[in-house]
């Protein structure tokens, strides 16, 4: 990556998420501490401040089918101070924003939306249901379902579909059994969402080791996703597994320091893994495959002393980007 472009300067930036809405690709970014939230347009470089934020932003996502509606999780402050956290609805009218707390959800951390048959299902995960102090992990988190099509946006109702995952931290979109789905992770492993014939949602086990974050990508071109993990919680190890049909076989392992912000994608048509270190070198790093069977990868530093919290690999037009929320430098950055 030859070019670094600082697109936003945000104190204690935590969230940085790129997504397409209609013809445009946007980046939503926000602070872990301050009431600073912005929407950045890739094609024009235009920045719009999303007003009404209390700070403590963990996630910012678009609502499919509505180009002017977005959902976020805010109110979770370091270190896991989140009794007032919740889901927020952001509506855009021309250049103005209207933000409302849609659901009080203590210790909310991650959210994603699945669209099935034209209906939007919002899933929100909490790291815990209650914490006496930041080190208290005695209570598992919850996974909540909100059917957005059944709401007016004024008052949401949620249904708990799981309350068994301790240190419920990771969430990512992927495809399993031919369907787009969401995976969540924690001490008990990785689980994915499945909808039965009656329309009910449940979680199913995919991997049975403690995982902080995960991403899925076809590294060797055989048409099957490999599993890339940070282990354990906020862990010290990056692992890559291949699914042999009966088990996940580890093919590569390397050290991290407070691993965070794991993502994967393609740069110049080649698979790449991107991950941050939130202690030690604080480096933003990439891993490129040389030989998966032999467990050989090229590890490179994208930027030292960045302290990344979230990263993403994506393409816009003819350009491949790495997006990173470099909290150490208070910057949301594009590399290309």
Q: Which positions does each model-derived feature cover?
A:
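Beta-propeller-forming repeat regions
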Residues: 1-336
